Amino acid sequence: DGAKIVGVKGKIGGARSEEPSLSFSSPLTISAGGYNCPVSRTITEIHNEPHRDDEHFCGGYREYWENVEGLGDPEGPIEIHFIDEVLPGYFWLFPVKEGVVNVGIGMLISEQRKQKGMKKSLKQIQRWVIEEHPRFKTRFANATLVPASQKGWQLPFGSPRKNAPSYQPRRVAMAGAMAVGDAASLVDPFSGEGIGNAL
């Protein structure tokens, strides 16, 4: 409604669905639909501001593994590794529960697009680290991948924008609407962690 968001409209099953459109009105609409939430996009579009800047988005890929060696306490510290083959990103191991670890890799999307060969694919880089890197191949020698645990996604960083127009970081609220979580770009650009910031 011009300078104010008054609700949402959409279809169950997405825009191409045969279902009829539904509309919901509210004095405050919460944008909680992830990094590409339509409400967040509308907030920036209304103000003629960029919604996305690849300098402030990270590509992430993770898998769950069982029986990775050298983890110590199942609720122990996370591991973040800056490996030459992964730069300008990092490789992580985060304990999830006893015997299970979240293993992943992340890289700025703007940098990932500049890579060549294996480094173009986070999944391929991760496979190489697990199978070939001298520091990790022995740790994963007897480990098993948890079936259907592979997932890739994009993380919107809450970092200051350098290019004009400069919004610190991205507009996340306006009359009638407010963004939360990934829709509000709350991911820490150093650690890739966003839950604490979102809370």
What residue spans do the PLM features occupy?
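FAD/FMN-dependent oxidoreductases across multiple families
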Residues: 113-199
